[in-house]
Structures are given as C-alpha cells and as structure tokens.
Amino acid sequence: VYDVGRVMEECLAIKPDLVFLWDEAWFPFARFHHVYRPRTAMEAARTLADKLRTPAYREQYEASLPRDESTEALLNQRLSPDPARARVRVYATHSTHKTLTALRQGSMIHVYDQDFALKVAEGFHEAYMAHTSTSPNYQILASLDLGRRQAALEGFELVQRQLEYAMKLRDAIDHHPLLSKYMHCLSTAEMIPEKYRASGIAQPLRTGLSNMVTAWEQDEFVLDPSRVTVYIGLTGVDGATFSANG
C-alpha cells in the first residue's frame, strides 16, 4: 500500500491542478480502521486540503524551495506543492461488493474535489446519467446502503478480526511441520526494500499494533497485513501452475 498523501503532494508540486482518480476496488474496508484510514484517497485528500491552508505549511513550503533545480537534485528531494496554486481534486472508485456487504456489482464513486461545483458537477452528472440505466436495480442500491450502515456500526471490529485471522493463517502455514518445508508467508522486509521503510520495522503487525501504526505513518510503502502472500518456490512448481492444479 503506497502513501497516497505523499504521491498527491509530489504530483501537485509538478502540476498543481492535477485531478486524481484512485482505484480502491479492494480497499473500501480501510475507511473503518484507524491504521488504514490515512492511506485512503478521501482521508488523504481531506488531510492534504487542511494542511495546505495552514500558515505553518506556507512557512515550511517557502523554506523547502530547492536552491539546486538540477534534475538529479530534484529527483532526490521530496517535492511540496505550492499552497497558493494547488487544488485538491480527488476521486476514488470502490467495488463495495468485494470487501463490504453488498450485492454483486454494487460499487461507489467517492468525490473530494475543491472545484467540483464550479468545473465538474454538470458534466459529471450528465456522464453518469448517460451511462447508467433508467431502470436501476434497487436491490443493489439497497444493499449498498446496508453495507454502508454495517460498516459504520461494526467496521472496526470486522477489520480488526480480519487482521487477527490473517495472522493466525500466517502462523498456521509457517509453523506447520509439512507445509513450512515447502512454503512460507512473505514478510514486509521480504517484499518492500529497506529504503522505502523509514521506520525500519520488518514485520509491523506481528510485533504489535503500535508498530503497525508507526510503520503506516512513516513508511513510503507498507504491506496490507490482511493480504497473505505465500512463497511456493520450494514446491517445484510456479504460481500459475500451483493455482491451476492446486
């Protein structure tokens, strides 16, 4: 999982009116857990918009203006958007049915666009009406409302339980007397180079929730602990063959 806020900051430093469309098809659940939430498009957009309005950021921006504008220097420096020019314009698509409770094809478009009313609203609604049905499936729409309600009431508990089950699955595979001879679950340190992990924490969740919080706050890339990646190189078959015949 990348640092959504950082990506947008550095892109807006180059093109201050850039519009972002984030595909969060498998990430709708993230809004409902405090560790995941800052790396969602909508939360990152709100945080960035608030940040750009503060006098402290203005001072920070002016102090960070590069003295050396050579390509090499710019590539090695974290870029910051100009608060006087940058506009936060962010859209995110969620396939709600994939990780929340909704009927198949139930999905949402989320919008945080400072220029929506002025530049986008009319065209957006026209495009939506042009591509949607005049006979919508109200069962799907109702399931979206139910899924949203369930997530609002029970979301944290469900996500936390999901993390616990994922860790139990990792432990079961890694400590199984037979399975562990041929496969193991890849850790953060094995999948993300050290230079992208400022926290230096090799296995964030396994060493405690507080370490997961630290890693997700500091690292440029993090591993979603609810996703289990199993290395099967010692089985003698590749992933495609294993998937097809397993």
Where in this protein do the model-derived segments appear?
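Conserved PLP-enzyme active-site core in the AAT-like
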Residues: V1-L178, G208, M212-D219, L223, ...
